[in-house]
Regions:
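Short, acidic Ser/Thr/Gly-rich low-complexity loop/linker segments typical of extracellular
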Residues: 3-20
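The feature captures the LRR N-terminal capping module
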Residues: 64-87, 101-105
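Conserved LRR concave beta-strand detector
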Residues: 122, 144, 152-155, 166, ...
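Short Pro-Gly-centered beta-turn/loop motif in secreted/extracellular proteins
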Residues: 20-32
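Core hydrophobic positions of leucine-rich repeats
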Residues: 106-113, 131-142, 153-163, 175-190, ...
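Feature marks extracellular polysaccharide-active and adherence modules
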Residues: 124-126, 148, 159-160, 170, ...
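Extracellular beta-sheet/turn segments enriched in Thr/Pro/Gly and aliphatic residues
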Residues: 47-65
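LRR N-terminal entry segment and analogous cap-like coil->beta motifs
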Residues: 85-149
Length: 249
């Protein structure tokens, strides 16, 4: 049974309780369908040939939920490994808002035990608002990371992820750490990273909070079209491109 059906004059989209989306309709060659959570892409399907009448196309937008209070470290490792065993390189996970280091470590171990190749995994983590310090340290397998709900990030969060090519973040209010002194992207080649920020992102001002170096969102000034945006700079780093309403590259 479908939990949600959207009608258009050309197609119908239904979904089941496991997060699979089924598409019925007429699409021309090379047309594309994206399944998204807010701005975060969960699945993309490109039609290499025109669609066949009365045939449905399954779009795998499966999301793994790791929010159960009783979930163990080993269960998380196994759940992540299962995704890799199924041949997936796009992995979508729902987490609790205040995800802890242990959960992220279990995800890391699952990716390692599942033999994820370096620079191959596109990881989307839905629901988590705070990323702890060193949360994704040495996640060598990451090609992209999407954190649509995140508002606060701890020091060295993405340090030493040499293969990162794309980072999508939520509307940030606080980011800890100074570039080249435990900044969140230390050990990454940010000039090769496409950064996507929330359209509501404010300019980040550096200072201190609780004795730690901290970037705090400005109350008034929008980031989009700011001097930093135009010069592709954010949190003291320079990026390949920065998208915030508009893309500068």
């Amino acid at each position: 049974g479908s939990s949600d059906m959207k009608w258009d004059q050309n197609y119908a989209l239904t979904s089941d309780e496991k997060g699979n989306a089924y598409l019925y309709g007429n699409f021309v060659t090379n047309s594309r369908v994206d399944v998204k959570y807010g701005e975060a892409p969960l699945a993309t399907h490109k039609f290499s040939q025109a669609t066949v009448n009365a045939k449905s196309y399954a779009l795998d937008a499966t999301v793994v939920s790791l929010t159960d209070e009783g979930i163990t470290y080993d269960q998380i490792v196994e759940d992540v490994k299962k995704e890799l065993d199924a041949g997936k390189t796009y992995i979508n996970i729902i987490l609790a808002p205040d995800v802890d280091e242990e959960t992220l470590e279990a995800i890391h171990i699952g990716l390692l035990e599942g033999e994820a190749k370096d620079w191959s995994i596109n990881l989307t983590l839905i629901g988590c608002k705070k990323i702890p310090s060193r949360g994704f340290l040495h996640f060598d397998m990451l090609k992209s990371i999407v954190l649509p709900d995140v508002t606060e990030i701890g020091e060295n969060a993405f340090s030493d992820c040499p293969g990162l090519q794309k980072v999508v973040l939520g509307n940030l209010t606080k980011v800890y750490g100074k570039g080249r002194e435990n900044g969140i992207f230390d050990g990454c080649e940010t000039r090769f990273i496409d950064l996507v920020l929330s359209k509501d992102q404010k300019v980040m001002n550096d200072g201190e909070a609780e004795g730690r170096y901290c970037w705090t969102a400005d109350i008034i000034t929008d980031y989009d079209l700011s001097n930093e945006h135009v010069s592709k700079k954010f949190l003291g780093y320079e990026f390949k491109s920065i998208t915030c309403r508009y893309k500068f590259e």
